[in-house]
Amino acid sequence: MTDHTQQFASDNYSGICPEAWAAMAEANRGHERAYGDDQWTARASDYFRQLFETDCEVFFAFNGTAANSLALAALCQSYHSVICSETAHVETDECGAPEFFSNGSKLLLAQTEVGKLTPASIRDIALKRQDIHYPKPRVVTLTQATEVGTVYRPDELKAISATCKELGLHLHMDGARFSNACAFLGCSPAELSWKAGVDVLCFGGTKNGMAVGEAILFFNRDLAEDFDYRCKQAGQLASKMRFLAAPWVGVLQDDAWLRYADHANRCARLLAELVADVPGVSLMFPVEANGVFLQLSEPAIEALRARGWRFYTFIGEGGARFMCSWDTDIERVRELARDIRLVMGA
């Protein structure tokens, strides 16, 4: 039976996947040591090292804003700057947290191509000024998959990494939808991270079947010095850390993280296919992850809302974002597509 509560405004609307829920229930049996000194945190960390094929440093935070902000703060000083895209979550949706936790590191906005930074755009910003009056560029942060649903290929990441190394910049990846990027490309997590030159990855779980929690992976272990103190100071050291870590065990041990991301991606592609022939509807960006960005008429947008659909319209006049989730019902996708056809007069 179709779940009519399902919406497409955000993949944060979805609930908790069975694997994460079961792991939390198992972790709830009896007592465990506190503050991350427990078997679940150790197991989750080891699963990440196995998955990424490297001995990375692993930390856990409650949400993506904290993960990104603390990771960036570890990579630069207050007089440094961070190069990001104009649509980056750290720029538009984190309430100044990256600047706050870094004691003032400035975000410098670079131009993008279909939501993605390029070596040229990074170079333009990094070399724009090199005098002492300008915040010294120190970090590049990119989002995988991007805020507009596009995905960096390994060669693109390697080219960006090479530019970063040439210019003395660290490379941070906001991986709120990293799982969706892996599922789309069929690449291993290692190929899309440290093997492509990424220093630090914030791996998102909340948008892919978990209740709360992101993992921060330092592939360059030297950059993780005293990071546990940063987490504690920022209120990110959970006393019962096992309940942040256990869901990761649940989703990682049998590759549920990848299956669910692939399902969300397939639902997004289905939606795009079902409305591809509707007059007046066009894709704003390629559908590569779990988001569909459609150009619609303003009356159609209002008509969809009047029919009870929830979605975001922060991407310009007539632009609408529809996000699919780990548990999106295929029939619900078809219902949305039918209503889009209806309100567009098709």
Swiss-Prot record:
Belongs to the threonine aldolase family. Its cofactor is pyridoxal 5'-phosphate. It comes from Pseudomonas aeruginosa (strain ATCC 15692 / DSM 22644 / CIP 104116 / JCM 14847 / LMG 12228 / 1C / PRS 101 / PAO1). Coiled coil: none annotated. Its EC number is 4.1.2.48. It comes from the Bacteria. It is an enzyme of class 4 (lyase). The keyword Ribosomal protein does not apply. GO terms for biological process: threonine catabolic process. The modification N6-(pyridoxal phosphate)lysine is found at K207. GO terms for molecular function: L-allo-threonine aldolase activity. Homotetramer. Catalyzes the cleavage of L-allo-threonine and L-threonine to glycine and acetaldehyde. Keywords: Lyase, Pyridoxal phosphate. InterPro entries: ArAA_b-elim_lyase/Thr_aldolase (IPR001597), Low_specificity_L-TA_bact (IPR026273), PyrdxlP-dep_Trfase (IPR015424), PyrdxlP-dep_Trfase_major (IPR015421), PyrdxlP-dep_Trfase_small (IPR015422). This is Low specificity L-threonine aldolase. It catalyses: L-threonine = acetaldehyde + glycine; L-allo-threonine = acetaldehyde + glycine.
